[in-house]
Amino acid sequence: MSSTAISRLIHPFVKDRFLHALLLAGVAMFAFHPQPLSALGGFIDGRTLITLLGLMLLTKGVEVSGYFDFVGRKIINRLHSERRLALFLVFSAALLSSFLTNDVALFIVIPLTITLKKLSALPVGRLIIFQALAVNAGSLLTPIGNPQNILLWSCSGLSFLGFIGQMAPFGVAMMLSLLALTWFSFPARDIVKTPNTEGYPYQRPLLLSCVGLYAVFLLCLDFDLPLYGLLAVFAGFLLLARRVLLQIDWSLIFVFAAMFIDVGLFTRLPPLQPAFAAIAGLSEGSVYALGVGLSQIVSNVPATILLLNYVPSSAQLAYAVNAGGFGLAIGSLANLIALRMAGERKIWLRFHYYSLPLLVWAALLGWVMS
């Protein structure tokens, strides 16, 4: 491997302040309450990391093929106003997240949106923010839309349609709220296009190879063989397009691993154990507030896992942790994926201009509807 390639791999780790903060927090908690090193590995959800890495590689492969550019040009040549385009992208992200899970939806819509930056003068950063919010709103509707819903559904005793019926009032209300916010946040002015937006060639063999590898990867996940699926994807790109392996955000994998370890250390801190044990005796309102608030600290999936140890699965708990996906970026892993993929430093602050008011609205709406 050349020195340029090595530098390209190392650079994101050096610049990743969020990863540095997670590592410092982990070291501090480990020093306060040491754990066996073997336990640290147990905190990491290996399947999630493998799935994330596989999707990152496959999405980057499609991007390198040029197909996102091709589709992006088709879209902006059909939808001529910023508002119509924003509504289309936001609704598409929400719809995909309902049935493909929120992270898979993001790996489809975010790279496509990023290509629009090359084709027009669109506010791509704002579009990505709204797509991150959209997958939080859309994924809460179904049992398979996000990891917390999968957990809640498995513990609820409800049928697939029964769970959808439980979540529908909140999901529809949040989606309508987000579409209304999208309408007011994007003007109806015409899209200013760059020259030569009528067509764009793409590498068909690489695209078809990515589609084939995607099918293999999904089958391996379905048969509970995620590592074999990842190895197949990795081997495929070694043979077809090695540059893909150098272009993905490798530090994101370490961010998620560090988050899993930090959450594991946090939930085992001795001073917090009496507080956790008291959860079972809390009132419904207190459990709801805790679900929303805890999601802002450890993210909504770990918050769900923790709370299900003490309270039963219910509509109220489901509304709480899904509302908690809004607010701070850490509230949902989908937020972190979207903002990292955007690659804009200022987007992290701008995200909270929209997400924090939506957290307040979602928390109030969820409480009233539950």
Task: Locate predicted features.
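Short helix-coil transition sites and intra-membrane helix breaks within transmembrane domains
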Residues: 60-66, 96-108, 138-146, 266-268, ...
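Hydrophobic mid-bilayer segments of alpha-helices in multi-pass membrane transport proteins
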Residues: 4-33, 45-57, 206-216, 223-238, ...
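Membrane-interfacial loop-to-helix junctions in multi-pass transporters
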Residues: 45-48, 77-89, 119-127, 204-208, ...
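C-terminal transmembrane helix pair
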Residues: 164-175, 289-370
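Transmembrane helical segments that form the transport core of multi-pass membrane transport proteins
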Residues: 43, 65, 69-74, 212-312
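Flexible interhelical linker loops that connect adjacent transmembrane helices
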Residues: 8-9, 73, 184-211, 243-246
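Hydrophobic transmembrane alpha-helices that form the pore/transport pathway of multi-pass ion
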Residues: 89-91, 95-140, 305-318, 346-348
